[in-house]
């Protein structure tokens, strides 16, 4: 648990803003943060980029209820959705300029869940820890989901917080409905080279 003031600032607020190391959000119209939890990074990005239309999505109803305080504060262009990300794929296929997730799941699964929601020439930004092998494991899924890795930004938040990797993936081709696999299959057989 992160409870100390300095840790909350560094590991939640500052960490959320590191996404701007790889993308200029002033040029984006909309952003989806799935598995948002308490609103990181999406809530922080919305505060710093008030014109950006932000969708915060989480399957945990308690977490979404907590975030309704933002709506009570009359924050414009903010949407809260209480569902699983795979339930949004048909409705918002090829829709968002940017889709991001922080501390959600492994890279192959994360990629297959996120990429269908990204529009052509949009970006999937995966905020990952220091495990470079996990990022490597995700590259096959990125290709299969019509993406190309444009950048991997490796940095340290602090000595105590450890290394981070921000993976910037550009979407090159639309996702078709026929490419969407059920969640159970995504989990059971992730898109990895050994699972062809």
Predicted regions: what they are:
Residues 1-26, 32, 62-76:
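Class I SAM-dependent transferase core
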Residues 38-51:
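Conserved SAM-binding loop of SAM-dependent methyltransferases across substrates and taxa
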Residues 49, 118-120:
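Helix-to-beta-strand junctions that scaffold the AdoMet/dcAdoMet cofactor pocket
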Residues 53-58:
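Conserved SAM-binding motif I beta-strand of class I
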Residues 75-85:
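Conserved SAM-binding strand-loop segment of SAM-dependent methyltransferases
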Residues 86, 90-98:
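A short acidic, Gly/Pro-enriched loop at the edge of an enzyme's catalytic core
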Residues 121-131:
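Conserved beta-strand signature within the Rossmann-like core of class I S-adenosyl-L-methionine
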Residues 139-196:
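SAM/dcSAM-binding transferase cores
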């Amino acid at each position: 648990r992160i409870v100390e003031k300095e840790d909350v600032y560094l590991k939640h607020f500052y960490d959320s803003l590191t996404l701007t190391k790889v993308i200029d959000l002033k040029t984006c119209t909309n952003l989806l943060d799935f598995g948002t939890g308490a609103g990181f990074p999406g809530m922080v990005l919305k505060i710093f980029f008030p014109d950006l239309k932000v969708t915060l999505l989480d399957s945990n109803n308690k977490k979404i209820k907590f975030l309704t305080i933002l709506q009570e504060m009359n924050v414009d262009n903010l949407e809260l959705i209480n569902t699983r990300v795979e339930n949004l794929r048909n409705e918002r296929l090829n829709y968002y300029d940017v889709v991001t997730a922080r501390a959600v799941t492994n890279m192959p699964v994360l990629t297959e869940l996120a990429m269908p929601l990204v529009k052509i020439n949009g970006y999937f930004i995966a905020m990952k820890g220091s495990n470079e092998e996990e990022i490597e494991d995700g590259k096959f899924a990125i290709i299969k989901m019509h993406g190309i890795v444009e950048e991997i930004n490796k940095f340290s938040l602090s000595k105590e917080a450890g290394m981070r990797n921000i993976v910037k993936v550009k979407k090159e081709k639309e996702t078709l409905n026929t490419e969407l696999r059920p969640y159970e299959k995504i989990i059971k057989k992730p898109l990895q080279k050994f699972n062809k």
